[in-house]
Amino acid sequence: MKIVLISGLSGSGKSVALRQMEDSGYFCVDNLPLEMLPALVSYHIERADETELAVSVDVRSGIDIGQAREQIAYLRGLGHRVEVLFVEAEESVLVRRFSETRRGHPLSNQDMTLLESLKKEREWLFPLKEIAYCIDTSKMNAQQLRHAVRQWLKVERTGLLVILESFGFKYGVPNNADFMFDMRSLPNPYYDPELRPYTGMDKPVWDYLDGQPLVQEMVDDIEKFLTHWLPRLEDESRSYVTVAIGCTGGQHRSVYVVEKLARRLKGRYELLIRHRQAQNLPSR
């Protein structure tokens, strides 16, 4: 049976993610105490219910991170496929969301401010984030988060999932990257008026960057680095690795390099491609 644990920071969109799981056909349970998870799985099996499970766990349920990882290992040992989805956002965004909704943080009390509560929650959940697929919702609305969850669900993962993500430095760096590479030293198609309207997925930009030796050297070096280190991470039983590729605006060079690496790594790893600035790319 496939079991998805959804966790993350309060205010980051866990409820939206759980609703998308329900819309995708999962049997969903919100705020389940972890010690009850094996009983829920057993009950589900006894009912001969083939519906996949999605369970939200967070600080409201008094989550013990050590226990969470033990429960995951236990269920995997029984043959279940257990995935972890972690939803997060930047601190300033979370503060704004709490201000807009006027809701209190689950850890807030007279002795702890909202910022202190957010910091404590982030530190508390970090060990769970380490083994999870992470979605940063800082620049997402609910519809975009739902789309990101649907894209993740489409990936049939049997081994290490490598997330290749392009981004623009001027919009901020992703905070969940395991490896980050900077493409700003490469020739920039943006300065060619004929190429500016295109993106790194379009043939004119591909033809231009394919003809740049420095670009090809960079792609070769990144591929060599990943080929060397990804097997080591896989040996450590890592489930997900995020490789972030950045350029100035996230339109040309980073998109091209991500697409190029995807072609080279295809067949060796399960891949998920994310273009972080997709909503900012020109439409033609």
Swiss-Prot record:
Residue sites binding ATP per the record: 8-15
Provide the function of this protein.
Displays ATPase and GTPase activities.
Q: Which HAMAP family match?
A: RapZ_like
Q: What is this protein called?
A: Nucleotide-binding protein NMCC_0698
Which molecular function terms from Gene Ontology are attached? ATP binding; GTP binding
Q: Which family does it belong to?
A: Belongs to the RapZ-like family.
Does ATP-binding count among this protein's keywords?
yes
Q: Does the keyword tRNA processing apply?
A: no
